[in-house]
Each structure stands twice: as structure tokens, then as C-alpha cells.
Amino acid sequence: MSSATTYIDVNAPVSDDIRSQIAGADNNALIVRLMFTTNHLSRWLTPIHDPNRLERSLYRGEPTAKELVIALRNEEQRVYPKMHLIATQTRANLDTLPEWQENPQSVERDTLQPTIVLMAQFRRLRQSTCGLLRSLPDDAWGLVGRSRREPDVTIRQLAERLAVTDYRYLRALDQTLDQVGARQGLAEIQKTHLDELLTLVPEHLTL
């Protein structure tokens, strides 16, 4: 992992190795990878009982742990409706979906919510995503959603994008928890870093 003084940038490049792992995973393994994200969050965040530890960053402009969880939830809210439309409608037109936008009321509500509640919201959304993916035969992963606003996309491509997004935000969260001292006093198993956790993710899985 990066040193404790590295500026944390969610949009830092994702290595070719990580991208290859995601692209090379079969559909079942990709579902497991997406579900593991909720496990990683629970492992890291549930033992931290002081909410202030999750709402601070080391440098100005860096995301807090809470902000990273919100971003993961928001991305799930953007992507799931697209997946569902493609899976349930012939010749799905993604432009019929309203563009997802964060409104001031939800921003204010998020400010008042504990990080653990926001994590639970993300978990419920991710469970819906994975439930949808599990219900699809392999050939349905290639179904395409059409759009004039953005490039056409398949269900598989959306799932891979979620996995890359997960990696970006989990990487930043792992670094943030270290840098702000949020893990002080926790058991070693609760401080396991992302690189080690990712070794548990299968690339191929036969069910």
C-alpha cells in the first residue's frame, strides 16, 4: 500500500493487472467480486465506533471514508437501473431513464446519516445488482442497452465498470483509514489491506 503521507486520489490509474483480472473473470466470479465489496466495507468500517474517524481526511481535498461510501452508493444508484432495463426490455433504450442527479435534500440527509447507515444502503443496492446478475443466463450478459447520450453498453460491461469503480474507491478507503488513524486499536483481521483481500477473489467459478 502507499505510504501514510501519500495524497489520495480516487481517480489514480488502475493497473493493467487489475483491469485484466476483472475482464478475465467469468460471470460467476465477477458476481462474487462485486459481493465481496460489501464484505470488505463491513470488515473495515463496522468495528470503528467513533464516527469522527470516518469523517476526516489528512489533506484538504481528499475524500473522507464517509464520502467514499456515499460515492459507491451513488454509483450503484446510477448503474442498477440501466442493468435492469437492459435485462427486462427488448431493444432497451437507456435514454428513457432519467439522468441520475444528486439533489440538495439527499446531500443534506447524507450529512446527517452515520457512515454505517450509508454502508447498509449501499449493501442493499449491491444485493439487488448481484441478484439480478445471478438470475441471468450467460448469454444475457451480452444484451445491449442503446443510447444517443452515451455509448451503447452491455450488462457485462456495466458489471465490469462497477468492479473497476469498486477497486478505485476501496483502494482510496484503505489508504484513508490508515492515514487518519481510524484503525488504531483494531484487530489485525479488521485491518487487512485491499491487496491481500483481493487474493481471495476467484477468477473462475463453476456453480
Per-segment meaning from a language model:
Residues 20-27, 65, 108-115, 151-155:
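A short, mixed-charge helix-start or loop-turn motif at secondary-structure junctions
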Residues 25, 29-33, 57, 88, ...:
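Solvent-exposed interaction patches of small proteins and small membrane subunits
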Residues 33-34, 102-142, 157-162, 172:
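Acidic/histidine-rich alpha-helical segments that form the ligand environment
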Residues 9-26, 33:
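Secretory/endomembrane lumenal or extracellular ectodomains immediately following the signal peptide
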Residues 38-49, 77-80, 84, 123-137, ...:
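Structural signal for well-ordered, non-membrane alpha-helices
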